[in-house]
From Swiss-Prot:
InterPro entries from the UniProt entry: IreB (IPR009309)
Taxonomic lineage: Bacteria, Bacillati, Bacillota, Clostridia, Eubacteriales
Protein name as annotated: UPF0297 protein Swol_0469
Alphabetized Pfam families for the sequence: IreB
Family recorded in the similarity comment: Belongs to the UPF0297 family.
Organism whose genome encodes this protein: Syntrophomonas wolfei subsp. wolfei (strain DSM 2245B / Goettingen)
Length: 90
């Protein structure tokens, strides 16, 4: 749908997609830990650069994270952080 100049674009992640992203992040986090990496540092590197080399191929973690757009990952992380820090539900 074309946007008018200055109009805010709406982005909505479906609940099933959110659960898929959470499961992938969990798997990637565990794989990075198992290989001795700092999962947070590696995920930040990936999120900033988009370079999959930050993610280990152990347990198919690299293949899994490449199936999800970084904006979807960011939405799930941001939503979780804000809900936990502000004590609010959806």
């Amino acid at each position: 749908m074309p946007q008018l100049p200055g109009e805010t674009v709406s982005f909505k992640l479906e609940r099933d997609d959110e659960n898929k992203v959470r499961a992938i992040l969990h798997t990637v986090y565990q794989a990075l830990q198992e290989k001795g990496y700092n999962p947070i540092n590696q995920l930040v590197g990936y999120m900033i650069s988009g370079e999959p080399a930050y993610i280990t191929s152990h347990s198919e973690a690299r293949n899994l994270i490449c199936k999800v757009d970084r904006d979807e990952i960011m939405e799930v992380l941001l939503k979780s952080y804000l809900q936990n820090s502000m004590g609010k539900g959806e």
